[in-house]
Amino acid sequence: MMVKAGCGTDAVIKEITPLLQPGDVLVDGGNAYFGDTRRREEEIRPTGIHYVGTGISGGEVGALEGPSIMPGGSKESYEIIGPVLEKISAHVDGEPCCAWMGTDGAGHFVKMVHNGIEYADMQFIGEAPSLLLAAGFNKAEEP
């Protein structure tokens, strides 16, 4: 399931869980807040359905060539879906860019940390020229 984070995710879950059976796995690949993922895991657990909050990263290239996949959920759920996720993920040196992150919203937590680092890097890159000019460096000068 790839749904915009928030109430839309809850609405889709409410709509599709009656169609699922105990032992089925529901993968949430949206950018959900990990606290919401924890709540959803707790709410769905009594049904016997495995809810897996999963961070997915890679943008357009990832969509075409395979993303980095960060699934959370129970270890049992990863044993069920891990082989499929590993096959569709990106690979580096023959190894899948996919690993179980842990329980309790861990997949979405790791994705949140990833996004924080990525956005900080982009902010730094965007501000670096201004900072260098303010420090007296001239882009026309040779190093």
Per-region residue spans from a language model:
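Conserved NAD(P)H cofactor-binding loop of Rossmann-fold oxidoreductase domains
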Residues: 3
